[in-house]
Amino acid sequence: MRASMVRRMAAAASSSASSSLRPAPLALLPPIPLYRRLLRAHRKHLPAEMRLLGDEYLKSEFRAHRNIDNPAHLIGFLTEWQLYAQQVEGESWLGEKIDQAKVEKLSEQQVGQLYELMMAIKSRREGGEGEGQESP
């Protein structure tokens, strides 16, 4: 009886220790199901203007990365898009800033693209607010 209790306690301790020390691995979706999930998330959770911008960006990124040969790049690409899908579906991303560590890893071209995206969002917001103020 004592040995079985020790085994149960050891099993419980090892399972809780392993789960608390490292998160469970994220099961990556294949590219096409992930792409469809992202489009559905945009359709369900984003306003029309943001959806159009998001869908265009999503399509261009998936097209640009269609022929990736490096497995590390593929895993990184799919992981980040899957995390994005979870954020959009959970709506925890609203008003959230980009992690500084991720910004530091961006290339100059990516920083430029991010800046262009920020300016497009700002101009759409200002355009939308201006239209709302003009109508009586």
From Swiss-Prot:
The keyword Zinc does not apply. Residues 1-24 form a transit peptide. It holds the Pfam family Complex1_LYR_2. Plays an essential role in the assembly of succinate dehydrogenase (SDH), an enzyme complex (also referred to as respiratory complex II) that is a component of both the tricarboxylic acid (TCA) cycle and the mitochondrial electron transport chain, and which couples the oxidation of succinate to fumarate with the reduction of ubiquinone (coenzyme Q) to ubiquinol. Promotes maturation of the iron-sulfur protein subunit of the SDH catalytic dimer, protecting it from the deleterious effects of oxidants. May act together with SDHAF1. Belongs to the complex I LYR family. SDHAF3 subfamily. GO terms for biological process: gluconeogenesis; mitochondrial respiratory chain complex II assembly; succinate metabolic process. One of its GO terms (cellular component) is mitochondrial matrix. It is found in: Mitochondrion matrix. Keywords: Chaperone, Gluconeogenesis, Mitochondrion, Transit peptide. Interacts with the iron-sulfur protein subunit within the SDH catalytic dimer. This is Succinate dehydrogenase assembly factor 3, mitochondrial. It comes from Pyricularia oryzae (strain 70-15 / ATCC MYA-4617 / FGSC 8958) (Rice blast fungus). InterPro entries: SDHAF3/Sdh7 (IPR008381). The keyword Mitochondrion applies.
